[in-house]
Amino acid sequence: MTPLKIAIAGANGRMGRVLVEAVNNHPDTVLSGALEHSGSEALGLDAGYAVGLKTGIAISDDVDAVLAQSDVLIDFTRPEPTLKHLQKCVEKQVNIIIGTTGFDDAGKAAIHTAAEQTGIVFAANFSVGVNLTFHILDTVARVLNEGYDIEIIEGHHRHKVDAPSGTALRMGEVIAGALGRDLKQCAVYGREGHTGPRDPSTIGFATVRAGDIVGDHTALFATDGERVEITHKAGSRMTFAAGAVRAAVWVNGKTGLYDMQDVLGLNNR
């Protein structure tokens, strides 16, 4: 079997470094390119330097050259560069795995349009455990239905720039969908001052940014006399990276827009 050629965007970032390692660890993939922004101090260095690997792949800012020798790009950067990379992937017929969060509606629309021409796995979280959590939350929300106050609490490291996290928002979307609600209409982001009694139709979000927290997420369902808490805690970024590589292998040869639920076969159940 010919190894799948995977390029990494943001290869010198916290997530990018782990992705390089994850590609190296997978028996059916090979690192074909590593991208960083122009002016990065990492340009020209071996992509594996930060994790003790010698990959033979130099970090580059030449998107066209990197994609020309790749089957798929994994991108966990920021919305603006991701959308630029997305357009290049469409032009080069390269699949793309998108773990970037914080897209506005226009950005999400661009991803949907691009999926008509290439294969895309776009997910708020690539952890197998988190995606099982989404599946569980759908069941819990349908069974508990009305009568429970719902709050989502998430925590990440001090460097994360968007809040709430994409995973927390996806948890909210799953729960709202199961209850027949529109998250945009029922979400409450933080509370301050004299807020009055809680509106039972809302889904609340609370955010923590501290230290080196990789990712903690809890969905709380509370009513008189009992609480149900569904929690996922990530201890290493490798859980996300390994899932992204798994998605890259899965989407090879496909066109269309998918998420991690598709990769795991959970949307077929």
From Swiss-Prot:
Documented EC number(s): 1.17.1.8
Name this polypeptide is given: 4-hydroxy-tetrahydrodipicolinate reductase
Enzyme's top EC category: oxidoreductase
Residues reported to bind (S)-2,3,4,5-tetrahydrodipicolinate: H157, G166, T167
Keyword tags: Amino-acid biosynthesis, Cytoplasm, Diaminopimelate biosynthesis, Lysine biosynthesis, NAD, NADP, Oxidoreductase
Pathway: Amino-acid biosynthesis; L-lysine biosynthesis via DAP pathway; (S)-tetrahydrodipicolinate from L-aspartate: step 4/4
Annotated GO CC locations: cytosol
Entry's Gene Ontology molecular function annotations: 4-hydroxy-tetrahydrodipicolinate reductase; NAD binding; NADP binding; oxidoreductase activity, acting on CH or CH2 groups, NAD or NADP as acceptor
Gene Ontology biological process terms in this record: diaminopimelate biosynthetic process; lysine biosynthetic process via diaminopimelate
Gene name linked to the record: dapB
Active site, UniProt feature: H156 (proton donor/acceptor), K160 (proton donor)
Residues the entry annotates as binding NAD(+): G10, A11, N12, G13, R14, M15, E36, G99, T100, T101, A123, A124, N125, F126
The organism's taxonomic lineage, starting at the top: Bacteria, Pseudomonadati, Pseudomonadota, Betaproteobacteria, Neisseriales
Gene3D superfamilies to which the protein is assigned, alphabetical: Dihydrodipicolinate Reductase, domain 2, NAD(P)-binding Rossmann-like Domain
Catalysis performed (reactions): (S)-2,3,4,5-tetrahydrodipicolinate + NAD(+) + H2O = (2S,4S)-4-hydroxy-2,3,4,5-tetrahydrodipicolinate + NADH + H(+); (S)-2,3,4,5-tetrahydrodipicolinate + NADP(+) + H2O = (2S,4S)-4-hydroxy-2,3,4,5-tetrahydrodipicolinate + NADPH + H(+)
SUPFAM superfamilies assigned to the protein according to its UniProt record, in alphabetical order: Glyceraldehyde-3-phosphate dehydrogenase-like, C-terminal domain (SSF55347), NAD(P)-binding Rossmann-fold domains (SSF51735)
Family matches, as CDD domains: DHDPR_N
Function in brief: Catalyzes the conversion of 4-hydroxy-tetrahydrodipicolinate (HTPA) to tetrahydrodipicolinate.
InterPro entries: DapB_C, DapB_N, DapB_N_CS, DHDPR_bac, NAD(P)-bd_dom_sf
Locations listed in the record: Cytoplasm
Family (UniProt): Belongs to the DapB family.
Species assigned in the record: Neisseria meningitidis serogroup C (strain 053442)
